[in-house]
């Protein structure tokens, strides 16, 4: 009880301070072919040599389209195409060194959350060269304006193109932590559905559920919410319920692809402003220990945690059930449960598992420790977990596999 009172007091004070900050959204450039506008943006920002950051798959398939645009415009660039899933401190430091050694003056991050997070953290190290990545973990520890930064999402889900966060994994301990600073918000978000056309179905599904988790958790984090973040979270949930499965079934459905990018953008800003919760805190432990893709972890954990919250979230989930057309009548409890059931049904239709059987017994105490340390006191979660309850949720994730 004492800890819970402290957490709520911390959140109340933080909320007062947060409302005094300027919460900038990236400038969106959207629509099919919008990557063609990148050279003009770079020239406007006076970037003469760009640091292009991505992963190996995107580097082979999608990055060449952007590099061709830079070549045609006569803009120099250096590439780093080795970002792994759940990027490490070592990767961040390699990008920073490459940037400085080649006198780059701007970033283009192409891909899902991993390349964007790695590039953000590297950009933070560029402006804070004497500060190790781990020393910038937590809130508002970057404190300096980044070089011009363009984010080009190739998945509709992570929201990294809009957020203040960069999630990095310690190379030695495998602990996953977040840098959170307003300066980490990219200046531009290039939302080109052509960049998501060839996504594997399993990536479309899990990153889409990642976006849904962002929107739902932000919506439930009432303390930090504003009218804008509430509206964007509601819109994102509705758009994901409508467009995710069509995008999953048909990668060439450009309307669905476009709307999913916009939904992910909205959800990204909503959780940037309002926060996330216990779903993310537990999911990050799976990424750190087992390299579980973040969207997959969120997709599996979301309905389990929502059920565990129980009546603390019935009213809000009932409203989402009405907005999405899942259920209009009945009690709040009935509508909330119908909403959770529909999330499970979406997972099932997109062949997402119901749990994880790879979690090892010996790792559960570490998972509990990391999850509670991430969530508290910063996240204004609907239900504050203690060790016993967090462990029980993790065991449900195992049992439901």
Residue ranges: model-predicted function:
Residues 274-338, 344:
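C-terminal catalytic subdomain
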Residues 165-274:
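Carboxylate- and glycine-rich phosphate/diphosphate-binding segment that chelates Mg2+/Mn2+
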Residues 2-106:
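ATP/NTP phosphate-donor binding region
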Residues 2-9, 317, 327-401:
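C-terminal charged capping/lid subdomain of soluble metabolic enzymes
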Residues 90-191:
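Glycine/threonine-rich beta-strand-loop-alpha-helix active-site module
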Residues 223-232, 247-259, 274-279, 330-336, ...:
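Flexible, glycine/charged-enriched surface loops at secondary-structure junctions
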Residues 94-104, 194, 252-286, 368, ...:
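Short, hydrophobic/aliphatic alpha-helical segments
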């Amino acid at each position: 009880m004492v800890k819970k009172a402290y957490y709520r007091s911390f959140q109340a004070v933080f909320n007062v301070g947060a409302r005094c900050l300027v919460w900038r959204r990236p400038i969106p450039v959207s629509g099919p072919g919008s990557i063609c506008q990148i050279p003009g943006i770079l020239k406007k920002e006076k970037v003469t040599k760009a640091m292009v950051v991505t992963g190996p798959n995107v580097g082979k398939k999608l990055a060449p389209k952007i590099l061709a645009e830079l070549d045609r415009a006569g803009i120099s660039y250096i590439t780093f195409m080795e970002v792994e899933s759940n990027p490490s401190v070592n990767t961040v430091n390699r990008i920073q060194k490459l940037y400085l050694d080649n006198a780059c003056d701007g970033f283009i991050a192409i891909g899902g959350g991993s390349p964007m997070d790695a590039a953000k953290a590297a950009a933070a190290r560029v402006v804070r060269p004497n500060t190790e990545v781990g020393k910038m973990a937590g809130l508002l520890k970057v404190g300096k304006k980044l070089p011009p930064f363009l984010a080009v999402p190739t998945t509709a889900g992570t929201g990294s193109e809009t957020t203040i966060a960069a999630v990095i994994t310690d190379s030695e301990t495998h602990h996953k932590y977040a840098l959170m600073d307003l300066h980490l918000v990219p200046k531009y978000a290039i939302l080109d559905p052509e960049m998501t056309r060839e996504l594997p179905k399993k990536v479309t599904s899990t990153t889409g559920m990642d976006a849904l988790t962002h929107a739902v958790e932000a919506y439930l984090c009432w303390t930090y919410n504003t009218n804008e973040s509430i509206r964007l979270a509601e819109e994102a949930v509705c758009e994901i319920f409508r467009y995710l499965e069509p995008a999953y079934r048909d990668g060439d459905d450009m309307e669905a692809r476009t709307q999913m990018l916009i939904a992910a953008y909205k959800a990204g800003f909503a959780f940037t402003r309002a926060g996330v919760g216990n779903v993310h805190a537990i999911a990050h432990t799976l990424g750190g220990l087992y390299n579980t893709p973040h969207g997959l972890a969120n997709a599996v954990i979301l309905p389990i945690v929502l059920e565990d919250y129980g009546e603390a979230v019935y009213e809000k989930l009932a409203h989402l059930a009405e907005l999405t057309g899942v259920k209009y009548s009945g009690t709040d409890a009935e509508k909330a449960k119908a909403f959770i059931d529909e999330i499970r049904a979406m997972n099932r239709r997109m062949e997402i598992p119901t749990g994880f059987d790879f979690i090892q017994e010996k790792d559960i105490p570490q998972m509990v420790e990391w999850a509670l340390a991430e969530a508290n006191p910063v996240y204004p979660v609907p239900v504050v977990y203690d060790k016993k309850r967090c462990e029980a949720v993790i065991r449900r994730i195992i049992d439901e596999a």
